[in-house]
Design a protein with these regions (language model features):
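Short, surface-exposed ligand- or partner-binding patches at beta-edge/loop junctions that are enriched
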Residues: 61-62
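Rhodanese-like catalytic fold shared by cysteine-dependent sulfurtransferases
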Residues: 1-20, 24-57, 66-105
Length: 105
């Protein structure tokens, strides 16, 4: 499984690179903090496969990186995705290293 650090994600955002960012956390978690991208809750991923690009890099994140890793593993093994990247440490790492104004939970 491919992964990316929060510093690498921030550089991509700053450089306005073309990629898709997907947040798979639950709605109540987005109310606490978010870093942008599309919201596709983990439990709704399979019914929203058409919203996940197969052409460009797709960075998937959750709170800590565990749920996103599980989703990526399933999408790669069951649906043939090859362009998915897990955000190491999830939004917790982003809040600690990039934007300390984000609320932790």
């Amino acid at each position: 499984m491919n992964s990316i650090t929060v510093a690498e994600l921030k550089a991509k955002q700053d450089n306005k690179e073309d990629f898709q960012l997907i947040d798979i956390r639950e709605g109540y978690e987005l109310d606490i903090c978010q870093i942008g991208g599309e919201h596709l809750p983990m439990g709704e991923i399979l019914e929203n496969l058409d919203k996940i690009s197969k052409e460009k890099e797709v960075i998937v994140h959750c709170r800590s990186g565990k749920r996103s890793a599980a989703v990526i593993n399933a999408l790669e093994t069951q649906y043939g995705y090859t362009n998915l990247i897990n955000l190491e440490g999830g939004i917790l790492a982003y809040a600690e290293q990039i934007d300390t104004t984000l609320s932790l939970y």
